[in-house]
Amino acid sequence: MEYLKWFELLLATISFSQDKICDRKSALVEIMEPPIDRIKLSQSAKDQLTKLKRLTKIDQWNILCRWAFCRSLAEPTIPSPVPIITDSNVEMSWRVFGGDMSDILLIALKQRCHNDGFPLDKETLATQFRLHLHRGIGYLAGDPNIKKIEDLIAIALPSQS
């Protein structure tokens, strides 16, 4: 799972057809509009993130959520369309979730949805975002090899062997 290579490939493959974009500025604003304003997690996801916070010493929900989201995007399978009950008190805006990377994460989500054959409407993007986020949290929390922050980093770096 080479996240950096994945993002480089993603950015290299995104192209916009000139005939579809008349007013580039308004098109860019529309393209970069987040699919969801407020991100709320399930209680199960909160509990899993609490475990990850303890293990990694990363104390901010949004940073762990970014790791989880990217972990799920790196998985080649489509997340199962399970209902997600957002019953925890963990909530953040899209901008808090993404920070300086919010536009890149949005592009990654859109490219993944396109690759998976999903439409790029706001509702589909929001659903796929929630599914990827929660799946990624589950993957990270369920990984017995993650016992400290270095283990989390090792997942993202290519093997040196």
Named regions from a protein language model:
Residues P35, S42-I63, W67, E91-M92, ...:
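Surface-exposed, Lys/Arg-rich phosphate-binding patches that contact polyanionic backbones
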Residues D59-I84, A141:
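Short, basic amphipathic alpha-helical segments that act as recognition/interaction helices
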Residues A74-D116:
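Short, positively charged interaction helices/loops
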Residues G98-I146:
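Intrinsically disordered, low-complexity, charge-dense segments enriched in Lys/Arg
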Residues I149-S161:
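Glycine-rich, aromatic-bearing surface loops/beta-hairpins
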